Structure formats: C-alpha cells, structure tokens
C-alpha cells in the first residue's frame, strides 16, 4: 500500500486498481489461494485508501489471464479511462515473455517501480515506458508466505487487517 501511495504521488495517476489475477500464466494454479480469499486480502489492505480499488475484473475472463486481453477489455468497458500498467522491475525483466507484449507497449503507458534484486536502465527504456523513483520497499508475497510457514510474525510486512485475516483463516500455514 505504501508503494501505491508513492506511485500515486510520483507517476501522475488519479487512482490505482489492483486487479487480482485468478491465473497468472507464469504461476501454477495450485500455488495460489482461492480467488475470493486473495481479493478479500486486497480489499482489507486498501481500506481507508479512497484512490485505490480492489478489482475482480479478471475473474470473469478466460484463464490463464493475459494482461493484453485484460487491458483491451477494460479499455472497452471503461472508455473514459486511460489505463497505465504498473509493474515491478522484476516483471519488466521478463516483459518480452508476456503474451502480446509488443501490443501492450504500443497501446499503453507502462510505469516500472524498483524491486530488490532487479535493475532497470532508465536510459534504455522504450517510448511510453518510465521508471519511477520510489523508495524501495523490499517485501514480497513470497517472503510473507515464507515467514508464515516458518512461524515468524508478519507484523509490519502486511497491514494488520490482512495479518489477522491470514491468521484467522489459517492461510499459508504449514500443512
């Protein structure tokens, strides 16, 4: 959420939609929680953030979810909006592996934010792609899951409401 606040301030955005993806083509479906649980955690994290919205838009789309299809569909459904793709530097490093990545590049603005272990050369970015200068927040969902599996507290890694939801529902706990 802190990163999203920084992006709102530095990237010239009106709002940020967190589109929960039911099936990322780069991840195994078995590794993901139930769609509704993941959406609920995003909703909890965004409470009190009027310019941030949790979206289940991809829940109604074919799986796996391809960003090109999502952006095209959202642009048709919301013609008064201009969508910008926000991705971490780690995703930018693999962007040429994405379905229809050239189409995304030619039709949508892309904003890249720093991620630990990934470096992006701002001078080499194509037109329409920018690197924002935000404070590095080196927390990943993988790290949160590893902490939980090891029985370590996740306070400070996720909002308290999300930590409570994870604990109350036994999510990511060792089996």
Regions found by a protein language model. Name each.
Residues 1-175:
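Nucleotidyltransferase catalytic core that binds NTPs
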